[in-house]
């Protein structure tokens, strides 16, 4: 369906607003993926707080202009599905990585995080970022471990001191 100028401007404005609030973006090629599978992907994306949209490449170039995702411009070739993660930087990458594992025709092209282009081969860097809760849990575990280790060393020193006396 052909879009008129107002329709194109509305799409650019809407998606640019999403891009401004996003932490990361992932670009993929969904040629050959069935509509049912794409519907599942979109549903999973909504649940994960990921905004997904298929947009014309010329409009995408305008959308990412002046954003940290400008580095993705060269990947806008062929059918392009773009996903913006607003809540967690790795959400879209994790979603696309899992979907690509089950759907051979789905191809992740690249991702962008904090203005840095991440090639498809290195998408794991973004997909494996811990969520806020996971990061806090790891930090607390490390702090607990350090405190417990200090206690053990103190008790061992006391034991050694008593044995020496």
Curated annotation (Swiss-Prot):
The keyword Thylakoid does not apply. Keywords: Ribonucleoprotein, Ribosomal protein, RNA-binding, rRNA-binding. CDD domains: Ribosomal_L10. InterPro entries: Ribosomal_uL10, Ribosomal_uL10-like_sf, Ribosomal_uL10_bac, Ribosomal_uL10_bac_type, Ribosomal_uL10_CS_bac. GO terms for biological process: translation. It holds the Pfam family Ribosomal_L10. One of its GO terms (cellular component) is cytosolic large ribosomal subunit. Coiled coil: none annotated. GO terms for molecular function: large ribosomal subunit rRNA binding; structural constituent of ribosome. Part of the ribosomal stalk of the 50S ribosomal subunit. The N-terminus interacts with L11 and the large rRNA to form the base of the stalk. The C-terminus forms an elongated spine to which L12 dimers bind in a sequential fashion forming a multimeric L10(L12)X complex. Belongs to the universal ribosomal protein uL10 family. Forms part of the ribosomal stalk, playing a central role in the interaction of the ribosome with GTP-bound translation factors. NCBIfam families: PRK00099.1-1 (NF000955). PANTHER family: 39S RIBOSOMAL PROTEIN L10, MITOCHONDRIAL. This is Large ribosomal subunit protein uL10. It comes from Yersinia pestis.
